[in-house]
Amino acid sequence: MGRVDPVSVVVDDGVGWSAWPAPAKLNLFLQITGRRVDGYHELQTVFRLLDWGDTIHLRVREDGQIHRIGESVTGVVEADDLVVRAAYLLKYATNVHLGADIFVEKRIPVGGGFGGGSSDAATVLLVLNALWHTRLDVAVLAALGLRLGADVPVFVHGCNAWAEGVGECLTPMILPGAAYLLLDPGVCVPTRELFLDPDLTRDASPATIGDFIAGTAFGNAFEPVLRRRESAVAGALDVLSEVGFARVTGSGSGCFVEFSTRDEAECALERLPYGLCAWVADGASRSPLLDVLKTMEF
């Protein structure tokens, strides 16, 4: 028995650098209710923020340039990196003369459905808005974030939420305290391929927040497709099913089980076979980034 944590890369914070949390998320429920005329799918989901995630290191530049420090975990070129795009988006929207150096201390597995890229981008938007003194309100920042990805707005708002539309129409939710046993199967399936899969259910009956609270809205539309396509995901779900109700987050491939307490989650972790990339995180009542920003003076 044992555990393997996701790899963490650390940068030495020197003069001018500051470090900021970029929390992960889970989708506690996800279904597809239809398809819009523009080709995008209508979703219903519940976003749960976690107290665990990446750390974004930022340093303001006076010369207006924006650079990512270090290599991207995914090998994405700098201009296409979401954190760089987020910084440029804010810069052009506000016509600010300042720039930034950005380093991502990565913990959230790439392509796991834990929201790492979206959360990183949201943290850059929120923090540079403060460091650059551009003072855009949250609604404007969320609208900018939506141009980067459908999951970015929930991280900008920083609260657990019921989401509809493509995931951007948010209703804040108060969720009970919980701890989560997370497992990364180590595979990445492009979301576009999953949406094109003929076995994906795209016409689920619309649910309500009340349905979710009552426990009649649950599961993830992508799970049966992922089980069929990816043996690693099927295996991860089977292993987790030995300790609780196993679910997929987002479009996968990450999986999780919810527990009432951290002690229960830690005990379940110890029961897993050795060598799995599994760990425990607590659910957050709101983004830890908001708490950090609230204590800072700019």
Swiss-Prot record:
The processes (GO biological process) annotated in the record are:
isopentenyl diphosphate biosynthetic process, methylerythritol 4-phosphate pathway; terpenoid biosynthetic process
Q: Which Gene3D superfamilies match?
A: 3.30.230.10, GHMP kinase, C-terminal domain
InterPro entries attached to this UniProt entry:
GHMP_kinase_C_dom, GHMP_kinase_C_sf, GHMP_kinase_N_dom, IspE, Ribosomal_Su5_D2-typ_SF, Ribsml_uS5_D2-typ_fold_subgr
Binding residues annotated for ATP, in chain numbering: 109-119
Q: In which pathway does it act?
A: Isoprenoid biosynthesis; isopentenyl diphosphate biosynthesis via DXP pathway; isopentenyl diphosphate from 1-deoxy-D-xylulose 5-phosphate: step 3/6
Q: Name one Pfam family in it.
A: GHMP_kinases_C
What task does this protein carry out?
Catalyzes the phosphorylation of the position 2 hydroxy group of 4-diphosphocytidyl-2C-methyl-D-erythritol.
Q: What is this protein called?
A: 4-diphosphocytidyl-2-C-methyl-D-erythritol kinase
Source organism of this protein record: Xylella fastidiosa (strain 9a5c)
Q: What is the lineage of its organism?
A: Bacteria, Pseudomonadati, Pseudomonadota, Gammaproteobacteria, Lysobacterales
